[in-house]
Amino acid sequence: MCGMEYRLKKGSVYEGKVEKVDFPNKATVWVTDEDGQKEKAIVKNAIPGQTVRFCVNKKRKGHCEGRLMEVVEKSPLQTNPACPHFGKCGGCTYQTVAYKEQLKIKSTQVEKLLSEVVSGELPFEGIIGSPVTEEYRNKMEFSFGDEYKDGPLALGLHKRNSMYDIVPVTECKIIDEDYRKILTCVQNYAIEKELPFQHKLSHEGYLRHLLVRKSVKTGQILVDIVTTTQIEHDFTELVNRLTSIEYKGTLTGVLHTFNDSLADAVINEKTELLYGQDYIEEELLGLRFKITPFSFFQTNSLGAEVLYSKAREYVLSGGFGDVAGSKPVIYDLYTGTGTIAQMLSPVASKVIGVEIVAEAVEAAKKNAAQNGLTNCEFIADDVLKALDNIEIKPDFILLDPPRDGIHPKALEKIIDYGVDRMVYISCKPTSLARDLVTLQERGYKVEKCCCVDMFPGTVHVESVVLMQYCGK
């Protein structure tokens, strides 16, 4: 095998068929060498059944890793892409795969990952699809840059495998017409005014990102132009252009955020309100939520209703153990803007949400008040620190951490509460699998689990796990 004999040479190009694709989008490609021996390579961004050409760029124990160069033969699963940006843009790897097959791929990936770490037979309930497969995004972060080195200004998404080149995505299929109009308007304005974009290597330039949020239920739209402070510019004319566009929804706010950080991310160092209000409102499962530019909120609103309904079902299944007959105290850790906390409010005596982003916590408090909920408390702090200071103990814990999962020390503190049951929502199955190992070692058993597709066309998927404490 490659990891022992290194038959496949680094820098050389090979051709092979994709046998399977594991999360996160790692395809197993088998290559027959000149001696007739089969060797394995891992190649990203491929689809089961494709014949691909790739260049070996890394060697690992037991296999090589390669960079996809060309699809020599399509997979039987593939159709023609609906989006003209497919292949250039870095997203929507599975767009050419029928949605039913996408769900099979994702479900198989999650089931395989969890089966490898869960003790006994995996109680896997399969996957639930998104109610919509196109125009489902309620938030987009576009980047300013150029399509090629020293080219004209472009506004869009990063080209696949590139941190520098930008693909204009005016016909993107996961955003609706209003996003496309805003994207075109802002790009044309920037070109006309000859505003320079910030170069990622030199960190010189002005324009960095365009953030757009749009509510599915209310149709409210929020636009945020993110720049450095290297130039002073009056955006009044751009605001006038944006407000004169005929939208399906309603433009309720335009913001200008200043960000001089070196990181290639939208970071709020200072924000000015140029027009309207600095938030939009979305409705989920009968509750209304204010969403600010930088607060976390699931990017597929209709999919979020499916995800949270399943999480709530898991929370309510089996009662609340020792607190049966009375309402439990529920911890919602990594609560974001408090969406799940508020959905659990009717069945709890108290819900305590913890979130490190202060802006999100303020939004959560306002949302709870707006929804008439008096038993929700939200704390702005890191979970690891906050757990030392909360006096009231939980009867049930809900976990919805960021992609990298739960800090090991925080996970130990969570386990030490000894609650009868927990629900873990994860947007990265590999992180979930790692944390489940620790949870099982400390006495928890997976009662049931499933996944929910929130991101059609992409490689991403959400997972939900219900755990029961069974003792060490």
Predicted regions and their residues:
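Terminal RNA-binding accessory module
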Residues: 1-81, 85, 377, 385
